[in-house]
């Protein structure tokens, strides 16, 4: 029976929950906002499957990539909307055009980060761009398995530990699965993210109401978030900032109507000035397992890994236009074929060049 006594030994991937046929494992949030599996001993048969699919207990060997590229999407608008080079999009589009399904992280209506799937080109946009919050996998491992069994191509994207969890959950190789992980700094607490959004809404409301007369306690302007980007490129890729778009609405009773004087507004902050990003980059509220990550150094089993190619200007200055350059690690023959089909603008590089200013490929994070 799976028992979590050391929280650094659970990455929250949901593999154990997903594999349990008796559904006696649930994910429950702790006081830091992270989900951990809890087993109902009264219904558990002690079959051991949950332990067999745990990527922390059953780690793969480290791997070096077959090929490494500096890459960028030829579509400037797609690259603008992406965190780095926009390489995820053509990979996903190719799968969908072949009748497949793409899984990735998106915002829900409350701006929580969840994993979901799409089989439309339009749906890919929701997965585009980094989300610096641990996403909830939910039932997506099982959904991916069903699509794979049907013979449909599946692209599953996520953090290295989520990809490792998926592969352990599947317990067999599928030729129609393309696993893509994003090189990860660590995943912040969803609870901290929710608190940040609550405090930001309150701050925006207070600033807006300053100096105004409140007619009624039931009639007030409330900021409604309409868009979030953790990596806005308004001032360039190397000076990415946090952007939050919002609009003010008047709420009276149960009715909500747009104020005629309201227009969408933007909060754009450099990372050092945004309290959430500052804490994230200082490693203050990452999941405990991130400080002891077992999925780095190519151990996730992904076919392709994607990251920012920081320092690309030192090697290929003519290729760097400060609009975003991706670091693409091709980890398998399947990944090589998939990447070649993207027709991306790319230069073959080396692992050492990519690693030079991207230590998260190998190094653990520590509290600053």
What are these regions (language model features)?
Residues 55, 61-368:
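Iron-sulfur-associated redox domains of electron-transfer enzymes in respiratory
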């Amino acid at each position: 029976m799976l028992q979590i006594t050391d929280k650094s030994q659970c990455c929250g991937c949901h593999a154990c929950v997903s594999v349990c046929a008796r559904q006696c494992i649930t994910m429950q949030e702790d006081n830091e906002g992270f989900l951990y599996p809890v087993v109902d001993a009264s219904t558990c048969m002690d079959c051991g499957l949950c332990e067999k699919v745990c990527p922390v207990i059953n780690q793969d060997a480290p791997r070096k990539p077959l090929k490494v590229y500096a890459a960028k999407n030829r579509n400037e608008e797609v690259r603008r909307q992406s965190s780095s080079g926009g390489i995820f999009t053509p990979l996903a589009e190719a799968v969908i055009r072949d009748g497949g399904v793409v899984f990735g992280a998106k915002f829900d209506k409350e701006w929580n980060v969840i994993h979901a799937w799409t089989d439309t080109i339009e749906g890919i946009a929701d997965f585009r761009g980094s989300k610096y919050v641990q996403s909830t996998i939910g039932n997506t491992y099982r959904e991916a398995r069903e699509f794979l069994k049907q013979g449909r191509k599946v692209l599953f994207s996520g953090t290295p530990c989520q990809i490792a969890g998926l592969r352990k959950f599947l317990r067999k190789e599928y030729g129609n699965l393309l696993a893509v992980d994003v090189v990860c700094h660590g995943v912040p607490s969803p609870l901290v993210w929710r608190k940040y959004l609550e405090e930001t809404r309150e701050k925006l409301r207070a600033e807006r109401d300053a100096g105004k007369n409140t007619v009624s306690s039931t009639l007030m302007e409330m900021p409604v978030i309409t868009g979030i980007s953790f990596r806005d490129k308004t001032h360039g890729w190397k000076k990415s900032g946090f952007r939050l778009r919002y609009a003010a609405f008047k709420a009276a009773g149960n009715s909500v109507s747009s104020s005629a004087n309201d227009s969408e507004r933007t909060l754009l902050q450099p990372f050092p000035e945004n309290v959430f990003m500052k804490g994230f980059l200082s490693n203050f509220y990452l999941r405990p397992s991130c400080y002891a990550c077992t999925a780095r150094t190519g151990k996730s089993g992904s076919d392709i890994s994607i990251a920012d190619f920081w320092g690309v200007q030192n090697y290929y200055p003519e290729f760097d236009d400060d609009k975003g350059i991706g670091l693409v690690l091709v980890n398998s023959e399947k990944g090589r074929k998939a990447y070649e089909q993207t027709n991306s603008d790319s230069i073959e590089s080396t692992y050492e060049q990519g690693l030079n200013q991207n230590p998260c490929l190998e190094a653990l994070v520590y509290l600053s």
